[in-house]
């Protein structure tokens, strides 16, 4: 793998003369501020074969840490008696695909960050210790086949009958599949109470891959000419790398373009990764995707518990999740069979990690798509200058959606000079008049204000302290009703001390 991998190792290894060894040397990336890998001997007790991307527990100074295997070699800068042995091999197989592994090596070199910390960032919190990757997963199977007697029993319970038919047709389903299909927990419990369905615990690797949709969704909307051109152009390279900047005005139907492209990938059994800039956008995005597609959709962002993030990570890695939606950290989500990466609102600065391992999720998404050999779509109504320059340099392909989709019309804008006006609670006479006119016609009015909250920040005048979010280091905004501090970046809420 002579590429950024070897280049990184050459740069990170000490300049001492190397010593040939008769046995195997394992190079491990340790989560430390040192920009290098560390040499170890294989475990004293024979274990599984060690491959790059597997976690190992190793002695490091006076403590033991969990690192990631980078490569094996026949030489080291240390004498054999100075090398320590790996304590435990924690995984049966690499946690990263070859493409994702190479993306992380590239990121460490490009962003000049210690390789061990890069690998740690890419892993869920629970996997940064000795937590096993494989977790037991709950699945449900039919105990009694759906025959005439059972159909009669469930004649008045149509929801129960259709859920039973679903489980029987797929042999076994997990809770995500049941939820995504629109069935409640109560319906499932009623089937179990009647001894028609039983719950089983199985290892996560036995959970079946998602079932590709057999036909287009009934919710699919007709495309205008510009949308058709965008979809047709992107589908030409649906099996190989290409980067597209989907430049569309607000309301131009970028999401519908995403949906139809994803539909094509799912029909071919391939997974899709969708990145959104903020946690606040995730629920509405997930809701639209789950309503549109019957395939499992998982979510990955910092607001989830460690256990929930590991579960989503596992489903994505094993291929049981068809679509993974998340914020910037989801760019590291493992995909069993990747088909497409989408970065919505690619211009948003929230895609940039500002502390620790500093990276741009948008740029990493492009590089990862290149390593995975899949298309990547960057969507925006106000594209970043970097992306526009890449289009000029023919690195990206520029697709424009210049008109609003459907029957939507561009708004009529009116600029009101309030410098000489008397305002009422901050509103001009013209605004109040036109607002009342719409209300009298039973229409709705949406008023945007230039600031959310009572005050933009909470600060101490004596020492200059500013209240910051413990989750993402953004400034907290003061809200009066209800009183509290809120992070407009990640959604964290804290009490307002008096």
Where are these regions (language model features)?
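Short amphipathic alpha-helical segment that frequently serves as the phosphate-/nucleotide-binding helix
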Residues: 43, 362, 428-432, 466
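C-terminal boundary of histidine-terminating zinc-finger modules
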Residues: 415-428
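A polyampholytic, Gly/Pro-enriched intrinsically disordered region
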Residues: 317-324, 421-424, 495-497
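Short, charged/small-residue-rich alpha-helical element at the C-terminal edge
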Residues: 249, 432-433
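Conserved coupling segment at the C-terminus of the helicase ATP-binding
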Residues: 382-383, 468
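Accessory, non-ATPase domains that flank or precede helicase/AAA+ motor cores in DNA-metabolism machines
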Residues: 1-380, 387, 392-408, 439-440, ...
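Cys/His-rich short segments
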Residues: 431-432, 440-498
